[in-house]
Amino acid sequence: MKRLLCALVLASSLPALHAANGDERVLAAKDAVQRGDRAKLAKQLEAVRGHELEPYVEYWLLRLRLEEAGAAELREFLGRQAGSYLAEKLRGEWLKVLGKRREWDAFDAEYPPLVQADQEITCYALQNRLRLADLGALDEARPLWFTPADLPESCIPLMEQLLADKRLGTDDIWERLRRLLEAKKPGAAKATAAYLPVGQAPSAKTLDAIADKPLRHLALQPSNFASSRQGREMALFAVQRLARTDPAQAAQQWEGIRDKFSAADGGYIYAQLGWQAALRHLPEALAWYAKAGNAPLSDEQVAWKVRAALRAQNWAVVGEAIGQMPKAMQAQPDWIYWLGRAHEALGRQEEARALYQRIAGQPNFYGNLADDELGRPIQLPPMAKPASEEVKAVAALPGIRRALALFRIDMRIEGIREWNWTLRGMDDAKLLAAAELAHRHEIFDRAINTADRTLALHDYSMRYLAPFRELKAMQPDALIMAD
């Protein structure tokens, strides 16, 4: 009898022992890939056959060999792992190699199945289209010039073609330079300055000096600084940079030189001053925004203009500023609500009510506020709980199994990516089942994040988890007060 019991205990523990052993080998494979040890990685791949994370070890080995791996070998993996996060990741990395090598036929074959192309791959795709005389590729590439960020190497030939074709001019170069300096991207700013005509480009030393001590630059600039575009732009950069630390002093410096600049330049500076003042809740914010006139505002600048107007209870400016927002931004519940409040304050009751009705009933803060404005009770929707069969079905998905295995061995970043990828396209019922599964495995951040994605069916107990509530309740009152 004792032997039978021992045998049963041993048999029941074998799967756990096998999983633990497999987990250790996966971690050993991870160490091997970090060291670039192909031989050890290949050995670990054989050792993890049948483990949930076998595809990860295989992917790591292929990634190390990507430059020399054959197309047939890569496509075989992509075929077996079709639709998975790893297939998407490997395909993206392979496309970058193909684009860099100018192997366009293979690139053409692999690009369409890619779900999420990053900017580097997108630019390779545009290069390929341009190679085939598709001039629309340059039209699509042009907006990238104005993004205040470093551009991947694959985008540079497109930008240089736009410059060569005069589709980007000197004003556009200065515009990108301004945006990069504003975004504190000195490396990209210096690279952009190199495209300016001879004699106009500021030196790297000048840009660094202004970024470090803007007030010193303004104090020491020559009296005829405004006679050149470079002189004016460097003064604008200095005022903009000073405004980030001391808007009042920046405004004082600006007032002393503003007559040397165009109205457009003045609008740019006043928009900067208004934005920085609004961030600090300074009373001058709205006045500076007003002086900016019709100057273009970034999404963040216009949002802070609304907030400054709300603080001042200036409902006319609230409505005006929301009207300056891009359409997608105007459609967000918070700005719909505040536009409704602005209409109501200005006596336009019907317009206000129509806006409240657009968001009333939505399961969010501003939907609740709209309900309140309409005199409707705020009610929680019926709680939706997944059936056990739904949880089992989600638990059986390969991507979910891989994600849970990654969390189990503390590869959280990879686990989150695998989890999020697998959630794509899930309806509310499946999302709630996935949230319940994450909760059972005590992966609380994924439980909350997943439950928060639902559109019609909701479980607020999952969105606002309190996994240690029982432990807290067990503490003596005196100890709770001491906390």
Question: Where do the protein language model's features map onto the residues?
Answer:
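Cell-wall glycan-active module
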Residues: 1, 14-483
